[in-house]
Amino acid sequence: TRSVEEYAKEILAMGINTVDSFDIHTQITSLRRSLDESAKAGKAVAIISAGWDPGSDSVVRTLLEAIAPKGITYTNFGPGRSMGHSVAVRAIDGVKDALSMTIPVGTGIHRRMVYVELEEGADFKTVEAAIKSDPYFVNDETHVKQVPCVDDLNDVGHGVNLVRKGVSGKTHNQLFEFDMKINNPALTAQVLVCVARASMKQQPGCYTMIEVPVIDLLCGDREELIAHLV
């Protein structure tokens, strides 16, 4: 994720479309502004943050907010392995391997359970402090545990429970819920594939998934898709 901007700019300058699963939520808008300029200069398309969250879940949140404009949405991830968080921990000096689990506490609040296998001679307290100060973890309750073998713990399953309670017009107590249990890398890859397809149908610039017409994610004749899905 931290290398997305650098590599995407190089590729966009060659006139080639890019899609990515950038997942540092607080930096998405600044990345979009940066890549929008590069994409337009290269006459190419960039679609960013196109995994399942951010990504397809963002589309669900947008739809729910449209049909219940007043209200609160809670996105509860997991329990499951976060690929982005796990990669971030592996990049820390002294870490041989790592697994970061996202545990839902409720109402959109999460706990991070991080399991680390250390390089020989690495100091656990130093590694723990580096993890807790990393942008991926600094805003969440984070627990770091040293284990002899991370591979013994690995499971690529993940999930999300997305709930919105709100108001449609003057009608209160509208409750919506979206729930899925998934194989994280498989779903992320599938989203990236359909977004790459959609990128071929957009004007030059940088987009997030909520800016892309959902029908553009699908292959097939537009009239047939409308007849089938509407």
List where the protein language model places each region.
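Oxidoreductase and adenylate-handling cofactor-binding alpha/beta cores
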Residues: 33-36, 56-72, 90-98, 136, ...
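Gly/Ser/Thr-rich loops at beta-strand to alpha-helix junctions
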Residues: 25-28, 49-57, 79-83, 185
